[in-house]
Amino acid sequence: LYILTHHEFSESEAIQLWEKIRKRQQEMQQQLNRHVSFRVAMLDYFISSNIFKNPTIIDIHLFERLQFQATYDELTQVFNRRFILYILKKELERAKRHKHDLTIVLFDIDNFKRINDVMGHLTGDKVLKLFTNVVKDNIRIEDSFGRLGGEEFLLVLPETPISKAFPLLERIRDILAEISGEKMFFTFSSGIAGFPQHADEEITLLHSADKALLRAKLEGKNRDYIFYKE
């Protein structure tokens, strides 16, 4: 941001600005009824907000690279851990404010270590990319999907009751079974938790989904479980 605007932002200011730009991106997409890149939304916001007092011309490829590194996981090109957790925090705040449902799904690719050990890391990378591509192709524009690390991923479904997650997970599983083939066949397990049923803080919500995921793994894998209080 400093490179573009010659203005130093604190971490809290930068986060607030990022949220405003993301909101502008969503508004532009709704108005135009098509995808609008984050870069376009950022420039539109900067210009309309008069943040560009002394704008600097920089190489567009450098700008895109910096933007990508701050937001996305390089291998899978979904949101990175920091950004998907930030989105979860903001979506949970919005759900509380407007009294909406919020569902999260914590994914883990089954037997991923064995895939890496037996078939090699290149195949492991292909599995991660295939999985993320299928998920991205089957979620809504308002949903957010990111990689927490390794073979673990988080899906945030705003304004969505838990029951609506199951048809989506079934569709993802069916598509993967159809296209992965015998040489690269793999499955996933998931843990599901929701607001307001299970938690009203992001850490507790994640912990609830993680418990449900562990239960799915222990009871045979390749299945989806909702968190329940014992």
Regions found by a protein language model. Name each.
Residues 1-65, 230:
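Regulatory sensory/coupling modules that transmit signals to nucleotide-handling catalytic cores
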Residues 84, 88-89, 105, 127-128, ...:
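Heptad-repeat coiled-coil signal-transmission/dimerization helices
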Residues 87-119, 135, 146:
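Active-site-proximal structural segments of metal-dependent nucleotidyl cyclase/transferase enzymes
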Residues 130-201, 213-215, 226:
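GGDEF/GGEEF active-site signature
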